[in-house]
C-alpha cells in the first residue's frame, strides 16, 4: 500500500497515472496536482470505476516551493512523481527535502529563463569546464546528492525512455552481455505520421530547444561538440524501415560517461523528417525559438512560448498518429576475451497506445517507464539515500516490469552498426 503525489497532468503524466492505476495493489492512493486542476479532475472522471486506486486532485504552482511544501505536508505521500516541466525540478526537490519524501522525475533540470545572470554565470563556467553548451545538464540535481543522503531519501532522475530505459539497457548490457563496453549508440526513431506539416510529439518548448542546440558526444574521455544537425546517418529500424537520423546532445550521455567504466564513445541519434527540419530552421531564423522576452503591444512575451500556444497540443495527436517508434541502444565491447555486438530496443505502436490510454507512443514510452520507476521505489527494489540516475540501480526488475506493462524489449546479437 502506498500514497503517491503526481505533479503534472499533461500527456506523459496522463499515461503514467493511468498505468499506475492498472497496478492498484501498489498504487493504492494518488493525488494528481497541477496548475490547472480542471485537467486533473477530468482525468479522475475518466478513470472512475476502472481502478481501485483512490484518486484525489489538487491545484499547485510547481514554481512555488511554499505551495509545494503545503501540499506535500497535507497529503503526506510516500513518493512525489514530478511529471511537470524540467524547469520545476529544483523547486520540487527542495519541497521533497523539506517534507522528508522520496522524489523522481523524467527529465533533468533546465532553466526557463536562460538570460538569468546568476544562472548564466554558472552555465558559462560549465561550458568551459565540460565542453558542451546544452542548457540542460545533471549538475544542478547532482548537487543535491549529499542533502538527500543526509535526509535518508532517494531521488531518481530521468526515468522516462530516453533518458531512463536507455540507461537501464546500458546497465543490463554491462551486467549480462559484456565484461567491457567500448561504444554505445542510442537510437531514437519515431516512424509515426500525425498528418500535420509541423507539430512536436512532446512539449514544443522543450523539444525545439533540445533539437536546435549544438550536438555533442562523448569520445575518449571528453566531449566533442558539433553544429546542430551536422552529423546525419541513415538506419534501417525494425518494423519502421529506413530513416534519416541526426546526432544530438542528450542528457543520458552525461551520466553514462561516469557510470559505464572505460566506455570509449557514447552517441545519441534521433530521426527527423525533412519537413520538420525545414520548419524548425525557418522558425529559428526568424527568432521564434528564442527564450528571451520581447515587448509586443505593451505586453512581454517569450517567442518560443508564444509558438507553443500556436502549435497542436501533443496530447491531441493520439487519434491521428499512425506508425511505430523504435528506441534502443547498440553496443560494442568484449565478453570472455572476445569482441561482440549487441542491440536492445523497444518497438511501440502509436495506435495501440491510443486505444489503451488515449495517447500517442511518445507520451506512452515516457509515461510507462515513469510508472515502472515509481513501482521499483515503492516496492523497495530501488531505494538508497542520495540522487541517482536509472543505470545506478539493478536493471532486471525494471526491464521485467516494462515487459509486463507495455514496453517489451527486443534483442539482436548481430546488429548493423552505425558508422
Describe each PLM feature range:
Residues 9-10:
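Glycine-rich Rossmann-fold phosphate-binding loop(s) that bind the pyrophosphate
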Residues 13-14:
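N-terminal Rossmann-fold NAD(P) dinucleotide-binding loop
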Residues 35-39:
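Helix N-cap at the beta1-alpha1 junction of Rossmann-like dinucleotide-binding domains, i.e.
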Residues 50-64:
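Rossmann-fold cofactor-recognition segment
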Residues 61-77, 88:
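Conserved Rossmann-fold cofactor-binding substructure of NAD(P)-dependent oxidoreductases
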Residues 72, 78-81, 103-104:
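N-terminal Rossmann-like NAD(P) cofactor-binding module of classical short-chain dehydrogenase/reductase
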Residues 107-153:
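Rossmann-fold NAD(P)-binding glycine/threonine-rich loop
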Residues 175-419:
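C-terminal catalytic/substrate-binding lobe primarily of soluble NAD(P)-dependent oxidoreductases
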Amino acid at each position: 500500500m502506498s500514497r503517491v503525489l503526481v505533479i503534472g497532468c499533461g500527456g506523459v503524466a496522463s499515461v503514467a497515472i493511468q498505468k499506475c492505476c492498472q497496478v492498484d495493489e501498489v498504487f493504492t492512493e494518488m493525488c494528481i496536482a497541477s496548475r490547472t486542476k480542471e485537467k486533473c479532475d477530468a482525468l479522475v472522471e475518466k478513470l472512475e470505476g476502472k481502478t481501485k486506486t483512490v484518486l484525489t486532485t489538487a491545484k499547485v504552482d510547481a514554481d512555488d516551493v511554499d505551495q509545494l511544501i503545503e501540499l506535500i505536508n497535507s497529503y503526506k505521500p510516500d513518493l512525489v512523481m514530478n511529471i511537470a516541466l524540467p524547469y520545476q525540478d529544483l523547486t520540487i526537490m527542495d519541497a521533497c527535502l523539506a517534507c522528508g519524501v522520496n522524489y523522481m522525475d523524467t527529465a533533468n533540470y533546465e532553466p526557463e529563463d536562460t538570460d538569468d545572470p546568476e544562472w548564466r554565470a554558472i552555465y558559462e563556467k560549465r561550458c568551459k569546464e565540460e565542453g558542451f553548451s546544452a542548457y540542460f545538464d545533471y549538475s544542478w540535481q547532482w548537487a543535491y546528492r549529499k542533502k538527500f543522503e543526509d535526509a535518508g531519501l532517494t531521488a531518481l532522475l530521468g526515468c522516462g525512455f530516453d533518458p531512463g530505459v536507455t540507461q537501464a539497457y546500458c546497465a543490463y548490457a554491462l551486467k549480462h552481455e559484456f565484461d567491457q563496453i567500448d561504444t554505445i549508440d542510442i537510437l531514437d526513431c519515431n516512424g509515426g505520421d500525425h498528418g500535420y506539416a509541423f507539430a512536436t510529439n512532446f512539449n514544443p518548448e522543450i523539444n525545439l530547444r533540445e533539437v536546435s542546440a549544438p550536438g555533442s558526444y562523448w569520445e575518449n574521455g571528453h566531449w566533442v561538440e558539433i553544429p546542430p544537425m551536422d552529423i546525419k546517418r541513415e538506419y534501417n529500424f525494425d518494423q519502421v524501415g529506413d530513416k534519416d537520423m541526426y546526432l544530438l546532445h542528450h542528457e543520458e550521455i552525461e551520466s553514462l560517461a561516469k557510470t559505464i567504466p572505460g566506455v570509449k564513445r557514447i552517441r545519441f541519434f534521433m530521426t527527423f523528417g525533412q519537413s520538420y527540419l525545414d520548419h524548425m530552421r525557418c522558425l529559428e531564423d526568424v527568432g521564434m525559438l528564442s527564450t528571451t522576452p520581447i515587448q509586443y503591444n505593451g505586453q512581454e512575451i517569450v517567442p518560443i512560448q508564444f509558438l507553443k500556444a500556436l502549435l497542436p497540443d501533443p496530447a491531441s495527436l493520439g487519434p491521428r498518429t499512425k506508425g511505430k517508434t523504435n528506441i534502443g541502444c547498440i553496443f560494442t565491447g568484449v565478453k570472455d576475451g572476445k569482441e561482440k555486438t549487441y542491440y536492445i530496443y523497444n518497438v511501440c505502436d502509436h495506435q495501440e497506445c491510443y486505444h489503451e490510454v488515449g495517447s500517442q507512443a511518445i507520451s506512452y514510452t515516457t509515461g510507462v517507464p515513469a510508472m515502472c520507476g515509481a513501482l521499483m521505489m515503492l516496492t523497495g527494489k530501488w531505494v538508497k539515500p542520495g540522487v541517482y540516475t536509472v543505470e545506478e540501480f539493478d536493471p532486471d526488475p525494471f526491464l521485467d516490469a516494462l515487459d509486463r506493462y507495455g514496453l517489451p524489449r527486443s534483442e539482436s546479437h548481430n546488429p548493423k552498426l552505425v558508422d
